[in-house]
Regions:
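GHKL (Bergerat-fold) ATPase N-terminal catalytic module, capturing the glycine-rich phosphate-binding loop
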Residues: 1-187, 192, 215
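GHKL/Bergerat-fold ATPase module in large chromosome/replication-associated machines
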Residues: 113, 134-153, 173-183, 188-633
């Protein structure tokens, strides 16, 4: 009998599970029951198209049998069963899931990596010193036995088993001073675990339970008769078998929803919001959806898979149906059960299924309305949600070229320079000053720096509010929207803000005409770094600022240059000088004196300063430092 070895990472994970102590090791039973339920689902699904199988849904079941004397716990199902190849494939290799890295990064946290990463069957080794799996597949003539004591490997041999299905026998570990493994042989403990973790399983989970009853009173018993009791065993169904999403809402507590969410979607935090939906008509379905309370560790990576568990008349046909959710709501978890979907539907035909599209559209509206209700009625929770998933909403607007701005626009939040807190676009508009035509915003990586920008101080001095956008996607999102409720978005560092008085405009035109040659000399000194040099009389105490023209702003340039393959993306820059500042007077004096070298030095200095103010890197920091020192002599 040959001993097969687990593969390298499988061995590490196995060792991790066997030798680590988890406060929630109870989940091993949940995992084994879930696997048994999946096997029953598969056999039932197959029976719908293969009448030779000859079973109904009522024939399928899961049975648990504890044996205190033998110290074994046996979980049996009459599901689809496994062939020798299935045993080798499913039980001989633990899929690489990143759980080792995750556990290493969270040394101090009591995190259930098994629940987090769905290692499933192997959680049995948390409580068992030996695991035996005896299985006979549907349509197979031979049964097979898989057996392992852990990291050293496993064996697969022929076995005797007449019925289709799988039997898993756990030989429990011996008790220690600190660990009581015998509790998993107690029928009360087992019943509680099934109720807690597996009550929604669709198939009956049965177990013989020891009970007590009073013996019949003898006919000749005297007045001094004392009742006598006897113990007996009775087969009991431990689970309700009604999925939580099909129960009347009045019968389900918040704690039930939270527990279902955490068990089903492998999270250790309660959801922020539970969304229930029952719809009849053109699209008949039941949905139970959740807004997670935290960002999944892989959410903003390519590895993250969106989708809802899709059931057809109670039979799961897809674990993650991506077509039920638009990308901007990809954070939503949940299940959808519809009687209108065909049981033998494939992934390919699913995409073209008209019922699925109707369900998706209905869910989209429902999710949007629930998020907006959370914004209105529970602001604190909504702001928690926004910190985790607001970026995805903004990506949704940008990625669809603004097509969904009407749907998503009133969910957006940005930091207000005036209010010093997060505000919605509706709240911004509601407090707009009389005569204000635009929604002003500044984009960058830090709210403090943005609030000190020359044009930011100008906008605020007019009594207008300013949205401080600090995420990479913010400006792209607002540019795609263009406006909100007929109020145009205006980047304070892109183009003319139009905030000058008529007198300031007239004075600026006169100054520009008087200093045309000076501006040409500055532009020449900067050698193509700016498209134009002009005066800006609204800069107050600031000598200079940098603005941009065209579709790409300076902040967008920064973002795009971080992306691979972006090439030499560059914004069109305009150098704006304050005609009322002493620096401008010094520039003008040097020009009138014919000191071209000094004008060139001032031009370089002011340009580099404007880059620093805008949060952009200067081309040559050493040359800049030398220039500053030289002008100080």
């Amino acid at each position: 009998m040959a001993m097969h070895q687990f593969k390298a990472e499988s061995k590490k994970l196995m060792d991790l599970m066997i030798n680590s102590i988890y406060t929630n090791r109870d989940i091993f039973l949940r995992e084994l029951i879930s696997n048994a339920s999946d096997a029953c689902d598969k056999r039932y699904f197959k029976s719908l198209t293969d009448t030779s199988i000859g079973i109904t849904k009522d024939d399928l079941k899961i049975h648990i049998q504890p044996d205190k004397e033998a110290r074994t716990l046996t979980i049996t199902d009459n599901g689809i069963g496994m062939t020798k190849e299935d045993l080798e494939k499913n039980l001989g290799t633990i899929a690489k899931s990143g759980s080792l890295d995750f556990k290493t990064e969270n040394q101090s946290d009591n995190i259930d990596i098994i629940g987090q990463f769905g290692v499933g069957f192997y959680s049995a080794f948390m409580v068992a010193q030996k695991v035996t799996v005896i299985s006979r597949a549907q349509g197979a003539d031979t049964a097979w036995k898989w057996e392992s004591k852990g990291v050293e490997g496993y064996t697969i041999t022929e076995a005797d088993k007449d019925d289709v299905g799988t039997e898993i026998i756990l030989v429990l570990k011996d008790d220690t001073d600190s660990e009581n493994y015998s509790e998993y042989l107690d029928d009360y403990t087992i019943a509680n675990l099934v109720k807690k973790y597996s009550d929604y399983i669709r198939f009956p989970i049965t177990m013989y339970r020891e009970k007590s009853r009073q013996k019949p009173k003898p006919e000749d018993a005297g007045d001094d008769y004392k009742p006598e009791y006897e113990t007996y065993t009775e087969l009991e169904t431990l689970n309700s078998m009604v999925p939580i999403w099909k129960r009347p809402k009045s019968e389900v507590k918040d704690e039930d929803y939270n527990e279902f969410y955490k068990n089903k979607f492998m999270d250790y935090s309660d959801p922020l919001r539970v969304i229930t939906s029952r719809t009849e008509g053109t699209a008949t379905y039941t949905a139970l959806l959740f807004v997670p309370g935290r960002t999944p560790y892989d959410y903003y990576t390519k590895e993250y898979e969106k989708g809802l568990a899709l059931y057809a008349s109670g039979v799961m046909i897809m674990e993650k149906c991506a077509d039920l959710l638009p990308d901007y709501f990809s954070f939503i978890k949940g299940v959808v059960d519809s009687e209108d979907l065909s049981l033998n539907i494939s992934r390919e035909t699913l995409q073209k299924d008209s019922q699925l599209k109707l369900i998706r559209n209905s869910l989209e509206k429902k999710i949007k309305n629930e998020l907006h209700a959370m914004l209105v009625n529970d602001r604190e929770k909504y702001e928690t949600f926004w910190k985790s998933f607001g970026r995805q909403i903004k990506f949704g607007i940008y990625g669809d070229y603004g097509m969904h701005k009407d749907l998503l626009g009133d969910l957006l939040m940005f930091y207000s320079a005036k209010e010093q807190k997060m505000v919605t676009l509706d709240e911004y508009i509601e407090k707009m000053s009389e005569g204000q035509k635009c929604i002003y915003f500044a984009a960058g990586d830090d709210t403090d720096r943005l609030g000190k920008l020359p044009n930011a101080q100008l906008v605020l001095s007019k009594g207008y509010d300013l949205l401080l956008c600090t995420e990479d996607v913010d400006e792209f999102c607002l540019q795609m929207m263009h406006d909100y409720k007929e109020k145009e978005f205006k980047n304070i560092n892109a183009g003319d803000l139009g905030l000058e008085t008529e007198e300031e405009k007239k004075a600026a035109e006169e100054t520009a005409n008087e200093n045309k040659d000076l501006f040409e000399e500055i532009k020449k000194a900067l050698n193509g770094k700016v498209k134009e040099v002009k005066v800006n009389p609204t800069l107050q105490e600031h000598p200079v600022t940098l603005s941009s023209e065209g579709g790409i702003s300076m902040e967008m340039e920064k973002v795009l240059r971080k992306m691979p393959g972006s090439g030499d993306v560059e914004s069109t820059k305009v150098l704006e000088l304050n005609p009322n500042h002493t620096v401008f007077a010094a520039l003008k004096a040097a020009h009138e004196a014919g000191d071209t070298a000094k004008v060139d030095q001032y031009a370089e200095l002011l340009y580099d300063q404007s880059l620093l103010i805008a949060g952009l890197p200067i081309e040559d920091p050493v040359a800049y430092a030398q220039l500053v020192c030289g002008l100080m002599k």
